[in-house]
Structure formats: structure tokens, C-alpha cells
């Protein structure tokens, strides 16, 4: 290192808007800065071929370019593969990838999911675990079929079958890879390390056979059955949907709510007022339900004279809706209404069936249809207290029918009335509207009811209603259908127990959204009457109807008399490009038959259905390995998962399907397993435990990602204009309104991930996701928010390294003097350097930043182990703030010290170098690109002695002995004093460079005063004041007012709140505050007795007295004397001049060691005095050899704020 280095010029600081009374000196002068290399200069200039260990980096890095370089470096050196190889024998941390569907373009919401999935495996790998990250692709089901249908211009099942099932299936298979390149590019560019080469694919034969095995297991145990139930039905697609799928499609709609009159058969002048929100179901009405315990009123309609029957509690409500009087003439019980017959709203079925009766099991006869029945679900929350029942279109309605059927003898039971076909259109059963889609029939039906005098009232009813989750415009209907179901209700309690052991983030998901869904569990509607999906592996005897399940294609081929495989063979011969995985799909698998084991001569034929694609994805814990047919060791090792994460909509999707399948197959532990199947012999844990939870132990439930954009009103007949940033909207013509909402493909109200990466980089996006808020909160994608991540974190960290490298280059700091380093450059190994001193021997600020580093390490590890990336990032941000805004800033003079061999200077370099190395490791999981860039720079002097990548390093371990809590607390208070002092200046509009006479620091107690007084010089410099005083009594400088916290105090004191407010306002605020601080409460004497108010009951407000400016922190109040003397003003002008000269040094591309000469032209007497009075300070701060007041010959003129600046750059050769 050089024996001597020059004094460094201080970096210019950003000027404040106000001049604080001193005026902007650059508006009052003409300034010439002349760059020279005087022969007598004691400085030196670093040459271009210097052998320094470090090089100053680019001042304004382009992070996207740096990231592309890092990606190439990772590829070149197989860094991901190396990271796995280094943990080959380490304990496992298991991550499951929730499989996306690659037949749609990825958007920023997918970036959030993949970033969260990446950060924890990276962290756990650095913490010593082996984390295999197997990618996956969800390739079956409605998402794929709908997209292919759109491409082909077809929608219904009839159109698909007319097109041809075989070519349709082949198109589905090829379409799932349509955007594969975009997904792979996104994954790579975001820095998501995952094994794409060996990804599991749900249509692959090995995966399908694993699913078949699980279904055979359920079938053999009697858990998979065929039943006639009311299901949520997608009429346009011709298939039932599961509860999880239905849950993803709800949205708010307005439907007609009708009050319809059902005249009683035996009292035609009296009508039941029956309520429904689905008028289209009225032609299939079978019953009207009442609650036996309710009181019902018979009222007279003042307009029509009719007698109406409805719940007594709802008479006033209905009268209000009708806007006329309803007079109560009698009250009756609900029980008395049960059994009464009525005229149905539409008579088609009555005409055809002629109002039949049936023989009761208990004897006697009763009408099969159109009578009042009892039901506990009837309420008076809304409607009329009488509910229309159409059992074909409601699960609860259907349960009533099931109960009613048990009352009648066989052969005389009521049949289900259903006037709607599977296509959602009316059939011959309701001929007047045959072929009309039910949701389009409501208006016609209500008009018919009005014309017949049956419609009493019509209004719009706002409620949530399900639509197909993959066809947004298609509303679902409840519909009777024979489907295959899994008896998940049998496992409800076990699923709840399993769920109770899972570590959910946020925790309320466990007993809230997810727990509630489990509580209301219904049997899983598994089968789909569709085409592209895992075929249901059940073959049925064509003679006896008996069935068996098949668990693999190999088992199927081994069946006696197998036939039909030639259909696949012929297809493959005709098109050799067809993947072999298609042979286990429709239509090829449908052709495979074999001899029935149940009756000689009969054949076994597969049922026609495929299964819910959510079952596919939920089976991935074992199906990704093709287990149990292969890879037993991998499955045992990789089950259950330690961590999964997806968005909140997956509580009814992938989270549920995994938990349900795993609970049913693998149970609670070996002790409760049923014998006879391989699944029930499996211990579902990798360690000694064999209990819940499985198949995942921890789950982060991500919030929804919303978009923020700017939208024009749009001219008539023209589409709206959508812009994605405020600056674009400001520059565009017309008025734009800021909008926030869901990401929309049609609106294109978000940037593509590739645009974001090219513009800001992946690290900026990742840090925004991790550090902006907890990931389970809804997050808004906005350009500005991601852009802000750059200066707030990435650039601040880069500038800290830049500061280090600039001065390390100047001074020749070379860490390779440490000759016994390990590959991770641990602090312990750096201690072998001759100039390295133990932390305990270094200065207080060195010990402080090391203490902060190790406190941060402990916090980050604690939070990341709890899957809390947000608070981990807050700790990192706080450390970086302390490093850059306090340690580096307060240590600059140490780096600028002229004695290059000073132990204190060496300490500063070693401290900053150590902390930067450790911080680079800490940030590696969060911002992997910047981390590796910094690692390459910081470790370059060591060459191959250091690991190639930071991602091969261990995560730093906190050392409790390095933590000095007392020092941390004291320095935190000192930093708060500096921060509050700057806030007080800003509030008083006093420039930072304007010195002030005094600062008063008011403390809550005197325990820290001695330590603070030993740092007076630091406080004076930080706050630019001449004197500092500390006190615990600030009455001379500030006054306090105490006001009620109305939200908290209102319920506590009630009507006395005005009295309390008046008493607090008239009391001495300073005395009340003292009482609050000493006693913990404030006591007031009310007429009713004493009232104690704690800190939550009141608010303390601060006001500085005349001549002072104040700001309050958590541990102090800082009060500045705002009186500015002429002497202080002149010093402030001199410091303004220094800032101006520093700016011009930058404009002239001065090196940090370059000496200059300065000339100032001004007629301002005060400024001239300031220059003469502070000449030494000005020259010392700016490395000026000369400072002249005079003319400026041959100078270049530069425009500045309110004045002119003349600059000449010459060389003194």
C-alpha cells in the first residue's frame, strides 16, 4: 500500500429547496473550477494498468445487463448443479412444485409465485440441506380443452365429437407445450432454480398409471362409487365440476328474485307466498317448504283483496316492497301448513301426471307432488318464509325428495321432475320453452307469471354465483347426474386433524378459509364427461354390470382375451410422431376390452369418463415419481414436502386435492392402516415420525396480484387507451384515470415479465415481492413500485460496494494478505492477514456494525425458518441502512486518512470488507443476481481460492458473542437523535448546510446521557450545530397537549367524553406527560369519581416553543435553536460553495485524488467575507490548491439555477 494518501474531497450532497435565510450561493456567483496536476501535489493518480486488487465499478450499473451476465456464468459453470452436488449427502429439504399449465402466457402474478418458490429452497440449500427441485406441468382438463376449443372455433361436446375425439385429443396434447419456451424463459430469467429437464408431466403414462393405482386403491376399499346426485354442472361443456373447481369461479351477479303465489287447493281464495331467486326452476317445482316452528300470518292484500300466507316476521318487509298495506287477519303455525296441497306455478307436469297420489309406508295415501313439506333450513332472514323446492336443481331440495320417497311404498314413490336437459335448455317436458337456455328464460317466465296473476313481486337480488372456472361467461347450474364420487366425507375429521398440524402462513388459513372448506366437505365429484384427462380406470362387465379397477397398462395387457390395442397401434403407425403416452388416453384406451372374470363369455369395457384434473395435480407427491410402479426410494425420501406455496385460490384447488388424497391413501400412521394394499403399508414420513402432517408440512398462501394502470375514457366507438405508468399518462393526450384491479388479458393492463426484466431486472422485481409486504397480502403490480426497489435497495448496496472498491483501489487494500483463507472467505480465516485485528480491539463503530450484522443474521434465520420472508427482508434493509447511511458515512474520514498504514484505517477496510462479504451471502436467496455479481467482485483478488459463486456458500451463522446489545441500543438512540434533528430542520425549512447554535435533546431518563455526551462531536457534526445539551425536562423548549383517543376512550367513558376532552385541554400537558411516564396513567377527577387513562386512551401532541423546531422519536425529542446569526449564515454560505465546487468536480470527471484551482467572481460582500473567513475549510474539503476571488478569462459558461457558472479545465504542465 502507498505510504501516504491525500485528503479525499467529500461527496456533494443534494441541495434542499429552501435556503434557510442564507440564499443559494450558486445564484450569487460566477465560479471557475480549473483542474490541475501541480508539481508540488502530494497526491497520486491511479494508472490504468494498476495492479490494485479492486477496481471501481460502474457508477450507474444497468442491472438487467449484469443479470444476463450472471445467467451466462451460471450456465457456463453449472452453478445450480454444483449447489446440489455439494449437498449430496446432506439432510433433505423437500419442495413440491405446484404444476402450472403451459398453454397460456405467463404474467407477473406467476413471477410472484415462482419467486417465493425459489427463495426458500435457495436459503435452505445455503443452510446445509439438499433440495431437489423437480418442475412439473399440469396438462389435462378443462383449461386445455377450452383453449383448444377456442382455437378450433368450437364449444359444445356435440361440436367436439363432430370434429373427432381423436384429432381433438391430439391437438390438446400438442397445445400444452404452446408457451413452453416462454415459461422456461421466465423461469430462467427470474432466477428460479428448478429441474426443468426432468419435470413431471401429468399426461405421461408413468404419471397416469400412478393415478390409476391410487384410484384402484380407493375403489377396492369402497371409497370410489357411482351415484346419482345433484352436482354443479357446466352445461356448455357437458360435465360436472368438483367443489374446488366451483369455488374458483364465483362472482357477484344480479338475478331476479320473485315472490310467486301458490293458491291452496282446498282454499283457492288463499295463496302461499313462495320465494325463489331462480325462476327458471319453477316449471320443475315439486314442493313448497315451511319451518314447522315458525309463526305464519294470513294477510289481506289491500289492493287485490286476496289472502296471502307468509312468515309473520316478514309481513312488514313484504308490505314495504309492495308499497301497500297487508292486514293480518289470522296467524297459524308452520306445522298446520304441512301437507296442504297447492296449484303449481306452471301446470305442464300437473296436466301430464294428473296430480297422482301414492300409498304411504304408514298407511293411507298422499299426493306425491305440489304440497307443503317441513324443512329446518327455512329462515326469516330474507324472502317470505316459504321456499320453492325443485329437487332437480338443488342439493338441499334433493335431500327433501329423498326423505319424501322413504315415506312411500316401492313403486309409488315420487319421481324427480326435471324439465331441463344436460345442455341447460328446456326439453319437451316444458314444451312452450323447448330449446331455450335456462338463464335466458327468466324474463319470459316472469312475464308469464305476471299475466297469469301469479307474480306478486319482482326485484333484483345481488349475490355470488359460480361460473365455470375456465369459461368465464358460462354460469353453472345445479343438475341431477349420475357421476363417480370419492367418499371424502368419511375422512373429514382426519383431514381436519391433518390440517391442524400444517404450518400455514398466514396462520388464519388453517382454521379459516381452508379449515372451513374442510368442515363443509362433500364427497368429491371425480368424473368428467369430457375427453382430455386421465381416464377413469374402471372396467365394467357388459353382462353383469360388475366392475373392477386397473392400476397399470401392463396389468391391462395381461388380462385374458385382451383386445383393442390395435387401435393405438394403427394410430401410431399412421403418425409415428404421436407420443406413446397417448395410448393410455381416450379414445385409444376406450377400445381396450378383455374377458370378464364375472361371467364366462362376457367382455369388460371401460367406463367412458375421465377424472377431475385437480385429482391429477393432487396426486403429484407420488405420481411425479411414477410410484408405486417405480422409484420407491425417491418417493420415500421426498415425502412429505417441507414447503409448498401457491396463491390463495388453491385452498380449494391444489392444497385441498393433495391433502385429501394423501389423507385417504396414507392415513394418520402405521397403527391405523388397513391391510392389503401397498399404500397402507407406507410410513409417510422421512424421519422417525409417522404421523401428520402430510403431504406437506408448511405452506405459504400467496395473496392475489392486482394491477395498477392508467385508462382513458375512450372516444365513442373506439377502445379505451391503457397506459402502464404515471409518466406515460402525463405525457399522453387526454385525461387518464388511475385504476386498480385484476390482471386482464383483454385490457393488457400489465407489462409482460420479459418487459419488466428488460427494463428493471429480475432482482428489482424479486425484492419488491419479498420486502414490500407479507406475501399473503394482495399485492399491486405497479411500474413505480418495482422501479423504487432499485434506489431503495439494489443501488444503495451497489453504492456501498462502489465506495469500498474506489478507496480500496486508491489505497491498494488487498485482502489476499490473509494467506490461510477458506473457500467461503469466512471472517475467521481472514484473521490470518497481518493487518487484521480482532473485532474487540477495533473502534466502537466497527464493533457496532459487527453487532448489527450478527443481530441481523439471527433475525433473518429465525424469520426464514418460520417462512416469513417479509420480516427477514426488513431486517436486511435495516442492516443495509445502518451500513450505508451510518457506518460508511461516519467512517469516511478513516478511509480518507493520509496515513495508509494506520491500524484504524486497516480496521475500517477489514470491517467493511467482512460485512460486505457476509451481507452478500445473506442476500443471495433474495436477489441472486446482484449477490453473485458482488461476490465475484469481492472475491476476485483470491481467484480460485474462493468459491466460484455465492450460491455455493453456506449461509452465515450468527455469533452471539459478537452482539453487544447495550452498544446497539445506544447507537440506535444516537442515530434517532440525528434523524429527528434532520426532521426538525426540514419542518423548519432550514438547510442542512446552515449551521445552528444549539440542539437540546430531551430524553425519557438520564441513563444514556453519559454515553451520549462522549459522542458530542458526532452529534454536532451530524446536526451541523455548535453545541449539544441533554435533559429529561423539556418544558423550556416544547409544550405538550394531551387529547383523547376517541376510538378507544369513547366506549370507556360514554357521554363523559366532552368533559374528559375539556379537562385534558385545560390541564398542563407537560405535567400530564410526566405523570403518564412515571405512573403509567393520567388520573382525572370526574363528578362520578376518579378516571385513570393509560397511554392507549390518550394521544400526546408536541409543539415547539418560539425560536425552536422539534421532532419526536420513540426514545427522544430533538429541539433545534432556529436563530441564525450572521456568523452562522456566512459559514452556511461557505458550505454551499463547497457543494457547488464538488458538483463541478463531478462534471469535470475529476478523480478522487485530483487537485484543483478555484476562481469565484462575485460582488456579494457577505459571500466574499464567507470565502475569506472559511478559505481553509473550502480548500481542504474540495482538494483546492488555490481559491481566488476575481475575473474568469477564457472560461466556459454553464447555466445554473438563477445564475451562471464559468468553468475551465486546463492542465498545468
From Swiss-Prot:
It is an enzyme of class 6 (ligase). This is Isoleucine--tRNA ligase. Monomer. GO terms for biological process: isoleucyl-tRNA aminoacylation. InterPro entries: aa-tRNA-synth_Ia, Anticodon_Ile_ABEc, Ile-tRNA-ligase, Ile-tRNA-ligase_type2, M/V/L/I-tRNA-synth_anticd-bd, Rossmann-like_a/b/a_fold, tRNAsynth_Ia_anticodon-bd, Val/Leu/Ile-tRNA-synth_edit. Keywords: Aminoacyl-tRNA synthetase, ATP-binding, Cytoplasm, Ligase, Metal-binding, Nucleotide-binding, Protein biosynthesis, Zinc. GO terms for cellular component: cytoplasm. Coiled coil: none annotated. Belongs to the class-I aminoacyl-tRNA synthetase family. IleS type 2 subfamily. Its cofactor is Zn(2+). A motif ('KMSKS' region) lies at residues 742-746. Residues 1-24 are annotated as: Disordered. A motif ('HIGH' region) lies at residues 100-110. It is found in: Cytoplasm. It comes from Rhodopirellula baltica (strain DSM 10527 / NCIMB 13988 / SH1).
Amino acid at each position: 500500500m502507498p505510504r501516504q494518501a491525500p485528503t479525499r474531497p467529500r461527496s456533494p450532497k443534494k441541495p434542499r429547496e429552501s435556503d434557510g435565510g442564507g440564499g443559494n450561493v450558486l445564484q450569487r456567483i460566477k465560479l471557475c473550477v480549473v483542474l490541475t496536476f501541480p508539481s508540488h501535489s502530494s497526491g497520486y493518480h491511479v494508472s490504468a494498468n494498476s495492479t490494485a486488487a479492486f477496481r471501481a465499478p460502474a457508477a450507474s450499473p444497468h442491472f438487467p445487463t449484469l443479470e444476463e451476465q450472471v445467467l451466462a456464468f451460471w450456465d457456463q459453470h453449472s452453478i445450480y448443479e454444483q449447489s446440489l452436488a455439494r449437498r449430496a449427502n446432506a439432510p433433505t429439504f423437500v419442495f413440491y412444485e405446484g404444476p402450472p399449465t403451459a398453454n397460456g402466457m405467463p404474467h407477473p402474478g406467476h413471477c410472484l409465485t415462482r419467486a417465493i418458490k425459489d427463495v426458500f429452497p435457495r436459503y435452505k440449500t445455503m443452510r446445509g440441506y439438499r433440495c431437489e427441485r423437480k418442475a412439473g406441468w399440469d396438462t389435462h382438463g378443462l383449461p386445455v380443452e377450452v383453449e383448444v376449443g377456442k382455437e378450433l372455433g368450437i364449444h359444445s361436446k356435440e361440436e367436439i365429437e363432430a370434429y373427432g375425439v381423436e384429432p381433438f385429443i391430439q391437438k390438446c396434447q400438442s397445445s400444452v407445450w404452446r408457451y413452453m419456451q416462454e415459461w422456461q424463459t421466465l423461469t430462467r430469467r427470474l432466477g428460479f432454480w428448478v429441474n426443468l429437464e426432468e419435470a413431471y408431466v401429468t399426461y405421461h403414462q408413468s404419471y397416469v398409471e400412478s393415478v390409476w393405482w391410487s384410484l384402484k386403491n380407493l375403489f377396492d376399499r369402497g371409497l370410489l362409487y357411482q351415484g346419482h346426485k345433484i352436482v354443479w354442472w357446466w352445461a356448455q361443456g357437458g360435465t360436472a365440476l368438483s367443489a374446488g373447481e366451483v369455488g374458483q369461479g364465483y362472482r357477484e351477479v344480479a338475478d331476479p328474485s320473485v315472490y310467486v303465489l301458490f293458491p291452496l287447493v282446498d282454499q283457492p281464495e288463499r295463496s302461499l307466498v313462495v320465494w325463489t331467486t331462480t325462476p327458471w326452476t319453477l316449471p320443475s317445482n315439486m314442493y313448497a317448504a315451511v319451518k314447522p316452528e315458525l309463526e305464519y300470518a294470513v294477510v289481506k292484500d289491500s289492493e287485490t283483496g286476496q289472502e296471502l300466507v307468509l312468515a309473520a316476521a316478514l309481513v312488514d318487509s313484504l308490505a314495504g316492497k309492495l308499497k301497500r298495506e297487508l292486514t293480518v287477519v289470522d296467524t297459524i303455525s308452520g306445522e298446520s301448513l304441512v301437507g296442504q296441497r297447492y296449484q303449481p306455478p306452471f301446470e305442464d307436469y300437473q296436466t301430464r301426471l294428473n296430480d297422482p297420489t301414492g300409498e304411504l309406508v304408514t298407511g293411507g295415501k298422499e299426493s306425491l307432488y305440489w304440497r307443503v313439506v317441513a324443512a329446518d333450513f327455512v329462515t326469516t332472514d330474507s324472502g317470505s318464509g316459504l321456499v320453492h323446492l325443485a329437487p332437480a336443481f338443488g342439493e338441499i331440495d334433493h335431500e327433501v325428495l329423498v326423505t319424501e320417497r322413504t315415506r312411500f311404498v316401492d313403486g309409488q314413490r315420487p319421481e324427480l321432475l326435471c324439465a331441463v336437459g344436460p345442455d341447460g335448455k328446456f326439453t319437451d317436458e316444458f314444451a312452450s320453452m323447448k330449446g331455450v337456455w335456462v338463464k335466458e328464460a327468466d324474463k319470459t317466465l316472469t312475464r308469464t307469471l305476471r299475466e297469469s296473476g301469479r307474480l306478486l313481486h319482482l326485484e333484483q337480488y345481488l349475490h355470488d354465483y359460480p361460473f365455470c372456472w375456465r369459461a368465464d361467461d358460462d354460469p353453472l347450474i345445479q343438475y341431477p347426474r349420475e357421476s363417480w364420487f370419492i367418499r371424502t366425507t368419511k375422512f373429514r375429521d382426519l383431514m381436519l386433524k391433518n390440517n391442524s398440524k400444517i404450518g400455514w402462513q398466514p396462520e388464519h388459513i388453517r382454521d379459516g378459509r381452508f379449515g372451513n372448506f374442510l368442515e363443509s366437505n362433500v364427497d368429491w365429484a371425480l368424473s368428467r364427461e369430457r375427453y382430455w384427462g386421465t381416464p377413469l380406470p374402471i372396467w365394467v362387465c357388459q353382462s353383469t354390470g360388475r366392475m373392477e379397477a386397473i392400476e397399470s397398462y401392463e396389468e391391462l395387457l395381461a388380462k385374458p382375451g385382451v383386445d383393442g390395442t390395435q387401435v393405438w397401434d394403427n394410430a401410431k403407425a399412421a403418425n409415428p410422431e404421436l407420443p406413446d403416452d397417448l395410448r393410455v388416453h381416450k379414445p385409444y384406451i376406450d377400445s381396450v376390452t378383455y374377458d370378464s372374470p364375472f361371467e364366462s363369455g362376457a367382455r369388460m369395457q371401460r367406463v367412458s369418463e375421465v377424472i377431475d384434473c385437480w385429482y391429477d395435480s393432487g396426486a403429484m407427491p407420488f405420481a411425479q415419481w411414477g410410484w408405486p410402479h417405480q422409484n420407491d426410494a425417491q418417493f420415500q425420501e421426498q415425502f412429505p414436502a417441507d414447503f409448498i406455496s401457491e396463491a390463495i385460490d388453491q385452498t380449494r384447488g391444489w392444497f385441498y386435492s393433495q391433502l385429501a388424497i394423501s389423507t385417504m391413501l396414507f392415513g394418520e400412521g402405521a397403527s391405523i392402516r388397513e391391510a392389503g394394499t401397498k399404500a397402507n403399508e407406507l410410513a409417510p414420513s422421512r424421519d422417525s415420525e409417522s404421523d401428520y402432517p402430510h403431504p406437506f408440512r408448511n405452506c405459504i398462501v400467496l395473496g392475489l396480484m392486482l394491477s395498477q394502470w392508467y385508462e382513458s375514457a375512450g372516444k365513442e366507438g373506439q377502445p379505451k387507451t391503457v397506459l402502464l405508468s404515471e409518466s406515460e399518462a402525463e405525457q399522453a393526450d387526454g385525461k387518464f384515470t388511475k385504476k386498480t384491479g385484476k390482471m386482464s388479458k383483454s385490457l393488457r393492463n400489465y407489462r409482460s415479465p420479459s418487459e419488466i426484466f428488460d427494463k428493471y431486472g429480475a432482482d428489482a422485481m424479486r425484492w419488491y415481492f419479498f420486502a414490500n409486504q407479507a406475501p399473503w397480502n394482495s399485492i399491486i403490480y405497479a411500474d413505480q413500485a418495482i422501479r423504487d426497489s432499485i434506489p431503495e435497495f439494489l443501488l444503495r448496496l451497489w453504492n456501498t460496494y462502489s465506495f469500498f472498491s474506489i478507496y480500496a483501489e486508491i489505497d491498494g487494500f488487498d485482502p489476499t494478505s490473509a494467506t490461510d483463507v477458506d473457500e467461503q472467505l469466512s471472517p475467521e480465516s481472514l484473521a490470518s492477514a497481518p493487518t487484521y485485528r480482532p473485532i474487540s480491539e477495533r473502534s466502537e463503530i466497527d464493533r457496532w456494525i459487527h453487532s448489527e450484522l450478527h443481530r441481523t443474521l439471527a433475525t433473518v434465520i429465525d424469520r426464514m425458518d418460520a417462512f416469513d420472508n417479509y420480516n427477514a427482508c426488513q431486517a436486511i434493509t435495516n442492516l443495509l441502512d445502518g451500513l450505508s447511511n451510518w457506518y460508511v458515512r461516519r467512517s469516511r474520514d478513516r478511509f480518507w486518512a493520509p496515513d495508509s498504514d494506520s491500524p484504524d484505517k486497516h480496521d475500517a477496510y477489514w470491517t467493511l470488507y467482512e460485512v460486505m462479504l457476509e451481507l452478500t451471502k445473506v442476500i443471495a436467496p433474495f436477489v441472486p443476481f446482484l449477490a453473485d455479481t458482488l461476490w465475484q467482485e469481492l472475491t476476485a483478488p483470491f481467484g480460485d481460492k474462493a468459491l466460484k459463486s455465492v450460491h455455493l456458500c453456506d449461509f452465515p451463522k450468527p455469533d452471539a458473542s459478537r452482539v453487544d446489545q447495550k452498544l446497539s441500543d445506544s447507537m440506535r438512540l444516537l442515530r434517532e437523535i440525528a434523524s429527528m434533528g434532520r426532521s426538525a430542520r426540514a419542518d423548519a425549512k432550514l438547510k442542512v448546510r446552515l449551521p445552528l447554535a444549539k440542539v437540546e435533546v430531551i430524553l425519557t431518563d438520564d441513563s444514556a446521557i453519559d454515553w451520549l455526551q462522549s459522542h458530542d462531536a458526532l452529534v454536532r457534526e451530524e446536526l451541523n450545530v455548535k453545541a449539544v445539551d441533554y435533559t429529561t425536562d423539556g418544558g423550556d423548549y416544547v409544550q405538550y397537549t394531551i387529547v383523547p383517543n376517541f376510538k378507544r376512550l369513547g366506549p370507556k367513558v360514554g357521554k363523559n367524553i366532552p368533559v374528559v376532552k375539556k379537562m385534558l385541554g385545560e390541564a398542563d400537558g407537560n405535567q400530564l406527560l410526566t405523570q403518564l411516564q412515571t405512573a403509567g396513567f393520567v388520573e382525572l377527577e370526574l363528578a362520578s369519581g376518579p378516571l385513570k387513562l393509560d397511554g392507549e386512551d390518550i394521544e400526546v401532541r408536541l409543539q415547539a416553543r418560539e425560536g425552536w423546531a422539534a421532532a419526536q422519536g420513540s426514545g427522544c425529542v430533538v429541539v433545534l435553536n432556529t436563530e441564525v446569526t450572521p456568523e452562522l449564515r456566512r459559514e452556511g454560505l461557505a458550505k454551499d460553495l463547497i457543494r457547488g465546487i464538488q458538483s463541478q468536480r463531478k462534471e469535470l470527471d475529476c478523480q478522487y485524488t485530483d487537485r484543483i484551482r478555484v476562481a469565484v467572481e462575485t460582488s456579494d460582500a457577505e459571500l466574499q467575507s464567507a470565502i475569506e473567513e472559511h478559505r481553509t475549510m473550502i480548500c481542504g474539503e474540495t482538494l483546492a490548491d488555490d481559491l481566488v476571488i476575481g475575473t474568469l478569462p477564457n472560461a466556459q459558461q454553464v447555466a445554473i439555477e438563477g445564475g451562471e457558472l464559468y468553468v475551465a479545465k486546463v492542465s498545468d504542465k
